[in-house]
């Protein structure tokens, strides 16, 4: 059997990734729950770096936890990435030279690697139970929660035989090197883990099943990953992966040591780490509310990176052209929903008119205002109304409430309480004057409507301009605030507009 020191010496000479090595990054989530913004931010940064460098993004699935993994979650991941336009070069659904890309289908590959690690003396059988480890710590006056103590590293053949005779089952542990482990984090700079601070760790269960601690780096090595870009919560696992990579190089599985970069935590309200349970962490909730991919990608990019100190708004193309993992900040990034909405609003206003109109349809459909196929009249209303709200909303989900009155029948307008409260005492007089002014109009244009109402209500009745059109707005839309009134009346047409004012007049 190779001694630990010999093994460490043989395996520590693994070459580093050099500047000529084509960039290969990966996104490797577990299919559990619904996609959250922290996970998608990780996918985005990997994608942006791959596209910026002309490299490749590999998308694989870590689905070895059968109790928690689900096909529903897997398809939600696909949905999320496709909606955002985050595409991948190799992986699930698209294939590639390193298939299969689901860990649950790679069992034979892992068993082959395990056999080589055992033959090379990089792993050893560990029979100690958690209770025994804790008891040894207590007996030595140490904290019983220190973790594994290395007891099984140097078991004699007699001790091994005795444990086997007792019917014990062994896990396999990787030998950690007896030296400091230092690496240069692409985000945080040089980091050192002192010798002895990370105990030998289990890589294979007693039943022979490989653990995540083994399969994740093995997949990275076999797929030639050059840059491991992941969340800060995985920083503490890096020394174990460095040690494992040395062993994988020694047995011919790894070609080089990848570079590591740990992305900052995403914080929520009260400067607490954003939890999956926090509403703002749910990607699909943001989509339902009306975020568009361009706006959300822009904001997620700002969670640890920026185009420049004074430039918060940029396109996906600008992100790709400028993104460098070395520019990512290590400080925690706070998810500010108000800022996210404001940025989204800017991108909504940047959409071409036809594109904006088409993106409204699913939200109008979800609200029940249009069917699966729009009628010609609904198409006409939407084409004329969309420009009226594009400058006034930050989320697409705000549009149905603003446009509802245009799609409703004249006798289906419900007057909101706040609109009713603001009506003047002489409401009937105002509405009678409005009707008298509107009925004679021949060419039903916004300009003619405004001129007629201004003369009747402001000039003749002496109502202040700010309050003059409120009763008509309420009659037309049922709301105190609506898209531009005169343009809305043009969309409805003269007959419908007059019918609504008469109905409200009673």
Swiss-Prot record:
Its main location: cytoplasm. ATP binds at residue 276. It is an enzyme of class 6 (ligase). Gene3D superfamilies: 1.10.10.350, Glutamate-tRNA synthetase, class I, anticodon-binding domain 1, Glutamyl-trna Synthetase, Domain 2, Glutamyl-tRNA Synthetase, Domain 3, HUPs. Its EC number is 6.1.1.17. A motif ('HIGH' region) lies at residues 29-39. It is found in: Cytoplasm. Keywords: Aminoacyl-tRNA synthetase, ATP-binding, Cytoplasm, Ligase, Nucleotide-binding, Protein biosynthesis. InterPro entries: aa-tRNA-synth_I_cd-bd (IPR045462), aa-tRNA-synth_I_codon-bd_sub2 (IPR020751), aa_tRNA-synth_I_cd-bd_sf (IPR008925), Glu-tRNA-ligase_bac/mito (IPR004527), Glu-tRNA-synth_I_codon-bd_sub1 (IPR020752), Glu/Gln-tRNA-synth (IPR000924), Glu/Gln-tRNA-synth_Ib_cat-dom (IPR020058), Glu_tRNA_lig_a-bdl (IPR020061). SUPFAM superfamilies: An anticodon-binding domain of class I aminoacyl-tRNA synthetases, Nucleotidylyl transferase. It catalyses: tRNA(Glu) + L-glutamate + ATP = L-glutamyl-tRNA(Glu) + AMP + diphosphate. GO terms for molecular function: ATP binding; glutamate-tRNA ligase activity; tRNA binding; zinc ion binding. One of its GO terms (cellular component) is cytosol. Pfam families: Anticodon_2 (PF19269), tRNA-synt_1c (PF00749). A motif ('KMSKS' region) lies at residues 273-277. GO terms for biological process: glutamyl-tRNA aminoacylation. Signal peptide: none annotated. Belongs to the class-I aminoacyl-tRNA synthetase family. Glutamate--tRNA ligase type 1 subfamily. Catalyzes the attachment of glutamate to tRNA(Glu) in a two-step reaction: glutamate is first activated by ATP to form Glu-AMP and then transferred to the acceptor end of tRNA(Glu). Monomer. This is Glutamate--tRNA ligase. The gene is gltX.
